[in-house]
């Protein structure tokens, strides 16, 4: 589980680093090249959580439909040692909020990985064969994700 050292005024969003500018007059959050401008930290945290939920839900629905494996609950948490987890008995998917720092390709891979645990609650050869059937470049995505 990697730790990138960021300055207090920096943020990574969808694999791109931004400098955070707090402006109490900013009515909305907006991006300006390599800057993200927002009113305060609470608004920024809400923005990140809302966007994580939208993106994660989009890919969960996509991969549920493609695989025929359906989850019952999504939880987005701050996790220290995992990017995601799956309770295959309850069909719960848990994703780390920090996953929003990764590329869409990486996010999509992690989501397919967790959805696949609904069928294979392990990391067996069959588990990886199942993933490869749906995402032939998953090993490349996994490398990108871990780098």
Residue spans of the language-model regions?
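Active-site-proximal or metal-binding-adjacent scaffold patches in catalytic folds
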Residues: 1-109, 118-147
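Walker B catalytic acidic pair
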Residues: 114
């Amino acid at each position: 589980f990697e730790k990138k050292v960021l300055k207090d005024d920096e943020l990574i969003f969808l694999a791109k680093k931004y400098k955070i500018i707090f402006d109490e007059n900013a009515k909305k959050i907006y991006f300006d090249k390599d800057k993200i401008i927002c009113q305060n930290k609470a608004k920024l945290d809400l923005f990140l959580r809302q966007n994580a939920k939208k993106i994660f839900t989009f890919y969960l629905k996509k991969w549920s439909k493609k695989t025929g494996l359906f989850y019952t609950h999504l939880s987005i948490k701050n996790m220290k040692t995992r990017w995601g987890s799956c309770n295959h008995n309850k069909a719960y998917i848990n994703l780390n909020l920090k996953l929003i720092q990764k590329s869409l390709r990486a996010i999509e891979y992690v989501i397919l990985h967790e959805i696949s645990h609904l069928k294979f609650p392990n990391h067996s050869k069959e588990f990886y064969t199942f993933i490869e059937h749906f995402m032939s470049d998953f090993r490349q995505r996994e490398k990108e994700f871990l780098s």
